[in-house]
């Protein structure tokens, strides 16, 4: 959510000046319910290009590896993460939770929380140590609790413009 506080460049600059197509954001997305679900499925199936998949928050695998403790658009969030990460040209983890599992991953970790490509300091995490995006890159981590908003927008501009 710190992304919305970015100043240089701000969210409007990202869209207007740099041409980023913000497909969906929990605070800005107009699609809800079935419309949001269709949008995610279109991206996951490759029917809509997904250049940069940005994920914020920990991946929750409880209970018993099902991920059903964290449901979104009719499925466990972890299933969306798998499908969208595999469809994306670039995957970006924002914040300590997405990068490393954050505070929720501390023992005894009842939620089964982990980061995208790291679990705490150990390479691996939810997507595994060998994950690479369609562009051949590992997960790009922007740590912080929260991540600095300008780091987020500046890195997105750098990725989008090559």
Model-derived features with residue positions:
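Iron-sulfur-associated redox domains of electron-transfer enzymes in respiratory
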Residues: 1-162
């Amino acid at each position: 959510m710190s992304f919305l506080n970015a100043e240089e460049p701000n969210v409007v600059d990202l869209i207007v000046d740099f041409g980023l197509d913000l497909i969906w954001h929990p605070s800005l997305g107009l699609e809800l319910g079935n419309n949001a679900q269709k949008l995610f499925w279109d991206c996951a199936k490759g029917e809509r290009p997904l250049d940069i998949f940005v994920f914020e928050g920990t991946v929750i695998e409880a209970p018993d590896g099902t991920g059903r403790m964290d449901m979104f658009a009719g499925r466990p969030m972890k299933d969306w993460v798998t499908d969208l990460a595999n469809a994306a040209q670039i995957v970006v983890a924002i914040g300590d939770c997405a990068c490393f599992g954050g505070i929720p991953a501390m023992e005894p970790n009842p939620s089964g929380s982990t980061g995208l490509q790291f679990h705490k300091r150990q390479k691996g995490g939810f997507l595994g140590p060998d994950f690479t995006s369609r562009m051949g890159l590992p997960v790009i981590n922007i740590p912080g609790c929260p991540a600095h908003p300008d780091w987020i927008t500046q890195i997105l501009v750098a990725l989008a413009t090559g």
